[in-house]
Amino acid sequence: MNVRKRSGKVVPFDAEFIRRAVTLAAAAAGEHDPDGVDRVTEAVQAKLEAAGQEAVDIERIQDTVEETLFEQQFYRTAKAYILYRMQKEKERASGEWQEGILTREFLSPYKHMPNPMEQLGAFVYTRTYSRYLPQQGRREFWWETVRRAVEYNTSLAPTSREEAEKLYDNIYHLRQFLSGRTLWVGGTPVAEKYPMANYNCAFTVINDFVAYHDLFYLLMVGSGVGVRVLKSDAEQLPPVRTDLTILHKSYDPVPASERLEYTNLTFHRDTATLAIGDSKEGWAQALSRYFELITNREYEGITTLVVNYDSIRPKGERLKTFGGTASGSGSMMTMLDKIHKVVTAAGARDGAVRTQLRPIDLLDIANIIGENVVSGGVRRTSEIGLVDADDETCIQAKSNLYRQVNGHWEIDKSIAHRQMSNNSIFYRKKPTREKLHWHIQQMRYSGEPGWINEEAGLKRRPNFCGCNPCGEILLDSNGLCNLTTVNVMAFVQEDGTLDRSGLLEAQRLSARAGYRMTCRELEMYRWDRVQKRDRLLGCSLTGWQDMVNATGLDRAGQAQLLDELRAQARKAADEMADQLGGNRPLLVTTIKPEGTLSLLPTVSSGVHYSHSPYYIRRVRITATDPLCRVCEELGYPVLPEVGQDPKDPTTKVLEFPVKAPAGRVKGDVTAI
């Protein structure tokens, strides 16, 4: 028996499509009954075979499913199935489907496949990457997310349909991934308006005040940013005046139609008025205008700055482009106030109306900016601060973050912003044994400061200036990187052998996908120039130790495989660069921490061992997220975030039991 699809194509009958559709309808109706689903599927197949037709129309099959559900008294499931059919018919009639490089025919089987993720992976996917579809009144399915991301990536440079289909199939089956940022924003208006939202990693040297504009903007679009605040960097900044008075106009929100999108600075006698625009650009411009007023001597006659927040949308209003809700004007007011306090405190410290900011001031300002940012209503700020080896003030910046009050530890609110960044010493030369001993002792207490070896970085790239917050990408100032990942464990076959050809092909696709991301023009010129010059790729691996455990690969075998994977990525990247006429990538491979993406296939993160044979994986979620409420109703372990009000937390934590694949785990190996 065959099936005639709406396109007219005839394909073999497969009862699994019916079983999948009935299962989804039953789950939506709360009538999930595996035995009942089997009975309905078998009854539908029997009816169709009894009709004796060589090819059955898809509509006839769906009608038969409805009839059978009613006959077997699955009334709620029948209703859910009918509503689903009606919704799909509306979508087809509206012409919403716009066929790209991936055809409807190619995608059709994936729509009916079971989700390849286990419970933890499915939860993390739904929380993190599945976008809400307002016209359908639901979140994306996995096949739709992959389609959106792959269509976006392959649109950035000429790509064959065969390559796009291979990439899609690998991502769908969790063998490899584009960056988590692209899974979230790729193919949406966000990616068109804010291309830099695709990038995981960025870095800037704070040697001019424009760097703070860029830092603020990048954090708002969701990138993690490293900042370097060495003494030599601070010396390049112009002095700041510390006698400007800031007044905050009381907030009186204007209607949406009257809001300014961009920030407006006007002058009247000795007063400047800063009307902040209601956009990411507007907020970043406001910060730039402030620094211009306190650094440019042409504004010395301005004694007062009045800040107008009326165009900023009220707290809680839905953000249509990025998703999430608005933070309101309060966070912006707090940010400007705290930055100005840093500036005026520097003047009081030095006893001067005009003074040079020190590295600790620069670090404080970067952290205050980070404190103000909640990107897309989903992700909080990710920063790293790189400081001098002899800068005790910066090194000890977080030493007194907590203090005892009436027998309880409380955070010092005046410096609470300093928790926004992890800080590392930027060693420009080899430290003495005594210095290293001291450093290790410091790390025993709080894990900080970390260290960055500039000499080692310069051997790998001559213009190395710093790194991203996770520390795995070597960057020049105004440099960024988009990361891709191959799940090595997914290429272990049932007999315990490794599918090397499939793995190497995935690495080739990973490098090509990464290079395509460098072909997108970025919205900030300084960053776009560095991007086009360096074309950095970040081809990463995950599930490595799971693969080693499963295949028994020894150290020599691992080294050989890593060499092959590196060579494959470099070759693919260089070939694509030559094909498109762009620069060959300066760097191609890396290993990132692989936190969130590794949870989708639930494999060991990056090249790390699994934590233990059995462990509890805890995942944070916003307390008001409907997904959180569903998990609570289903009886999942849901707990308030540590340190928050147990009765009314803003963040909750879900617990998932995880069983690691057989083999060595973290406790079975030494630290070296």
For the regions a protein language model found, what residue spans apply to each?
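Extended catalytic cores of very large enzyme megasubunits
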Residues: 1-672
